[in-house]
From Swiss-Prot:
Protein name: Phycoerythrin alpha-3 subunit
Superkingdom per UniProt: Eukaryota
InterPro entries linked: Globular_prot_asu/bsu, Phycoerythr-like_a_sf, Phycoerythr_a
Organism: Hemiselmis andersenii (Cryptophyte alga)
Annotated SUPFAM superfamilies: Non-globular alpha+beta subunits of globular proteins
Note: The light-harvesting system in Cryptophytes contains phycobiliprotein complexes. Unusually they are composed of either phycoerythrin (CPE) or phycocyanin (CPC) but never allophycocyanin (APC), with only one type of biliprotein being present in any one species. Unlike cyanobacteria or red algae these proteins are not arranged into higher-order phycobilisome complexes, and they are found in the thylakoid lumen.
Record-linked Gene3D superfamilies: Phycoerythrin alpha chain
């Protein structure tokens, strides 16, 4: 008996949430167009596009090959000569931004002035 009551309740709730078939396609399209016009007006002020283009920039300092750095005692907790710096910087895009990246990437392992 309980299962029949649950079944009738489920069928009744499904019938209550059934979409009405009285709407015409033109009314649905008009409603969608009106919503598209009103949506930018209702957007919160915090959702506006930011004018500055800042991104996290990662700089890796690798001095494991030896340099005249600090002379304190080594702690033994990881790589002593390796440091990572993360900083928010403004990214300026221009015509040569892609070419500059390719130049840095391709020259990474090349010897400069006879020093590797």
């Amino acid at each position: 008996m309980m299962s029949k009551i649950v079944l009738v309740g489920l069928v009744g709730s499904a019938a209550a949430f059934n979409a009405p078939m009285m709407t015409v396609r033109r009314d649905a399209i008009a409603t969608g167009a009106a919503a598209a016009v009103v949506a930018p007006i209702l957007r919160p002020a915090g959702a506006a596009m930011k004018k500055n283009s800042k991104a996290p920039c990662v700089t890796i300092f690798d001095e494991r090959d030896g340099c005249g750095g600090p002379t304190r005692a080594k702690t033994g907790a990881g790589e002593e000569g390796l440091m990572v710096k993360i900083q928010m910087q403004e990214i300026k895009l221009g015509r040569g931004a892609g070419a500059e990246y390719v130049s840095i990437f391709t020259n990474y392992d090349k010897k400069l002035f006879g020093v590797k």
